[in-house]
Amino acid sequence: MALATEWGLTAQNLEGYVGAVDLNDRETELHILGHLDVVDPGEGWTVTSAFEPKLVDGLLYGRGTDDDKGPVLAALMAMRAVKDLGFSLKKNVRLIAGTDEETGFRDIHWYYDRHPYAPHTISPDADFPIINIEKGHYQPTFRAAWPQEAALPRVSSFTGGPRLNMVPPKAQATVLGLTAEQVNAAIAALGMEAAISYTVAPAEGGVRIQASGQNAHGSTPEEGHNAQTALLTLLAALPLADCPSTQVIQNLVRLFPHGDHIGQALGMAQSDDLSGGLSLAFTMLTLTDTGCEGRFDSRTPLCGTDATVRLPAEAALQAAGFTVEGEIDPPHHVPATDPFLQTLACAYELYSGRESHCIAIGGGTYVHGIPGGVAFGASMPGFVSNLHGPDERVNVADLLTAAMIYTQVILDVCGE
């Protein structure tokens, strides 16, 4: 907000939920929605640490450079360019910078509960060209409970991923009644993929096991290596007592087998020509001596319905002894023939030199559910930003191109 004010724009902090930046005091025609919050730093950074930005060969490394502070800055630069170059506008553009995109959208919901939608909305929180389809979400919570256990050997605790929309890079479990030698023998016989590693350490009455993998965005689970499902796979291979926790672990391995990224085992796998296939990441699980709670993150295509997604998953989980809570958040779809999308396409083609087209993603942005809203940039096609992972980066030249594209969009939508 301070930078926007320094650049001669009108900026305000709206009760800590969002920052709003206006180009003028006329009726608002265009909203640009970005966010300033970031995910956890994670591990595995090699170029720099997560919160020490570093420019190397035209790439700016650091957490949030691509998701989404860099793109927000590109939009702000576009607003400054329109102002500094003296273009006459008949309408206003408002940049809305949120603070809760990664953990629930409470910020943007708060804003639109109090302010009207704009006739046109874009979010620079994804890729170019135009994302006109954002898949739906089915992210239920399931639970099971049982009396205090005493049987040995058993799993007495399990801690999986910390975030619903992130493939877990770490998972830990305590196993009572087994030795490190027994567990290491099971690891050797398991044949797990090379990207997964296990460490075993002595603990009171047993061992502590940690699985390490690679995090990824929950909408693209195939790009990560799920430590949570890898650890469950190992636990199910151990000589555990026949008790409730063991039965739960075996059921979880059956319902969420390591490497199943499409919900095949839950009976949810499906796809359509416009939006592609369903994705699923089993991302959160806690287990104690008396119960467990888990969540998974599935992104549903346009063809996904209660009958083809929720009901099969509920039936499978309930048959395994779990209670289930959760509903489908429907997909977001703006027809490719919408005139606003044609305006965006022209601006993109003019400055990128590439042909525009519409695409579907599993990720969700602030425009999800906003009438006519689409995600538009700021990453160019083919660029690997490693968002949510180590060595997140943004291409500075592409960011400047994005700023030019957004400048043109502002002129086309809000100009005289």
Regions found by a protein language model. Give the residues of each.
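Short beta-strand
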Residues: 10-14, 199-202, 282, 358-359
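A non-catalytic alpha/beta surface segment that caps or lines the substrate-entry region
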Residues: 1-28, 52-53
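Active-site metal-coordination/substrate-binding segment of hydrolases
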Residues: 29-97, 103, 389-401
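Acidic-enriched catalytic cores of C-N bond-cleaving enzymes acting on peptides and small amides
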Residues: 132-159, 164-214, 218-280, 306-321
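An extended, acidic, His-containing surface patch that forms the Zn2+-binding/catalytic region
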Residues: 215, 219-289, 295, 299-310, ...
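A generic structural motif
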Residues: 19-21, 173, 205-212, 293-296, ...
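Short coil/turn connectors at secondary-structure junctions
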Residues: 26-31, 49, 56-57, 89-93, ...
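Acidic/histidine-rich catalytic neighborhood of metal-dependent amide-processing enzymes
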Residues: 68-147, 180, 184, 188, ...
